[in-house]
Structure formats: C-alpha cells, structure tokens
Regions:
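N-terminal membrane topogenic signal
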Residues: 1-7
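Structural motif marking the loop-to-transmembrane transition
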Residues: 3, 25, 46-50, 73, ...
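Lipid-exposed faces of alpha-helical membrane segments in multi-pass integral membrane proteins
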Residues: 7, 11, 33-37, 54-58, ...
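Long, highly hydrophobic alpha-helical transmembrane signal-anchor segments
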Residues: 41-85, 155-169
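Structural signature of hydrophobic alpha-helical transmembrane segments
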Residues: 16-33
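Residue-level signal for alpha-helical transmembrane segments in multi-pass membrane proteins
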Residues: 11, 15-18, 37-44, 61-62, ...
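C-terminal membrane-adjacent module
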Residues: 114-227
Length: 227
C-alpha cells in the first residue's frame, strides 16, 4: 500500500504540471483523480462500500469537469491548500503546552520522551519547527500569488480582472509542481547536514537517517499528524 500511495504521489505533480502548462482538462481531471485515490486508497483496498461510492461519485464529477472550460482551475488551489495545511500542522504544535512537531520526531528517533532531550537539542528542534512553518507558509503564499496572476486561466483572469503583473500558466506550473518541491527537498537535506554538524554521532549517513525515520512506523506518523 505504501508503494502504491508513493507512486500516486509521484504521479500527481507530473500530471498537474502537464495539465497546467497545456491547459488540458483531461489531464487536470486525471491529476485530481490521482489525489482522490491517494486519500481513499486504504479503504478502497479494504473494500469499504462508502469509499467506492465516493470514488465513483468523484469519477463521475471529474468526467464532467474534464470537458469544462474551468477544468484546470482546481489545480491552481491544490498547492496552496496542501502546503498551507502542512504549514499549519507545524505551527499548531508551537503553542503553549504543546510539544513542537520536530521535537517529537527527534525524541522518537532518540528513543526518549521529548522532555528528556538535551536542552540544546530541544531548542534546536523548536527553532526548526518554526523554520518549517514559516518556509511552508511563504511557499503557500507564493503559490497563491502566482495562481492569482497566471494568464490565461489564473484566479484574477478567471474573474475577468487584469492582473497588475502576469506569469504564464507554464511558469506558475513549474513553480507549483516542481520548484516548490525542490525548495522543500533542498531544505530537508540542508537541515540534515546542519544537524549532523551541530549534533554529531547520531546518524551514519543520510540513508541511515531516512531509514530510521521509516522505522518509526505508520502508527507513529498517524499519531503525529493527529497532533
């Protein structure tokens, strides 16, 4: 199931970019259908009737959307909503009495309670949680701004307004479906290198770091996302 979901996740930005750059309604519907499958994959594989009903209803709706002049419009908002949601997930853990999200992850990697982490590591992981929340919020706003001024078919253009500055749909799509992921990936790798320098001896390599994250298991990640 993990591999299937990962393949679907990798397929989405490709489909979304091609749909956005070409203004292709069929590809847009396929990209949105890909998202539906990502969300419903587990209950679909378990044969849940409600999941199949939702999937069939979504498929019917996307079939009609594919032929609409507004078929690519939802793709403008998907990167904004998804990135903003992840930024919120980081930010909500920074409130009083909460354990910052990165602190919880590092404590799990260290095999101890968050309060048992060394004070410098606790401070670092809190600052890192702030950094991720800010970076993702900025990316969400950038996605929204570019979606608004994309021509043709951007948010302002769709409302009949002429944007003060404009980018092409292809330029918006490259940022939303490629460059944004590159920024996140680069920040992730860069932070690993910084952490390895500041707190040496914890990970043998980047591959070891990823392996240890994976070994935390689905139950840990589900609980983490629930907050």
């Amino acid at each position: 199931m993990f591999i299937a979901r990962a393949l679907l996740a990798l397929a989405y930005p490709v489909l979304a970019h091609l749909a956005g750059a070409r203004g292709d309604g069929t590809l847009a519907a396929l990209a949105l259908g890909d998202l539906v499958l990502i969300v419903l994959l587990e209950p679909l594989l378990r044969g849940r009737a409600w999941a199949w009903a939702l999937a069939l209803a979504a498929g019917a709706g996307l079939w009609r959307l594919a032929g609409s002049a507004q078929a690519t419009l939802p793709l403008l908002l998907v990167p904004v909503v998804v990135v903003a949601l992840v930024a919120w997930m980081f930010g909500r853990t920074l409130g009083a009495g909460r354990v910052p999200l990165i602190t919880r992850i590092v404590a799990a990697l260290e095999g101890c309670a968050p309060e048992a982490l060394a004070p410098p590591l606790r401070r670092y992981t809190r600052a890192l949680t702030v950094g991720w929340a800010v970076l993702l919020a900025v990316l969400a706003l950038a996605n929204l701004a570019l979606a608004a001024v994309a021509v043709p078919g951007g948010l302002l253009d769709g409302l009949g307004r002429t944007p003060p500055v404009a980018v092409t749909r292809a330029q918006w799509s490259w940022f939303a479906n490629a460059l944004g992921y590159g920024v996140v990936g680069g920040a992730f790798v860069g932070e690993y290198l910084l952490r390895k320098r500041l707190f040496p001896g914890r990970y043998h390599s980047f591959a070891d770091f990823l392996h240890r994250l994976a070994r935390l298991g689905p139950a840990f990640w589900r609980e983490l996302l629930r907050g």
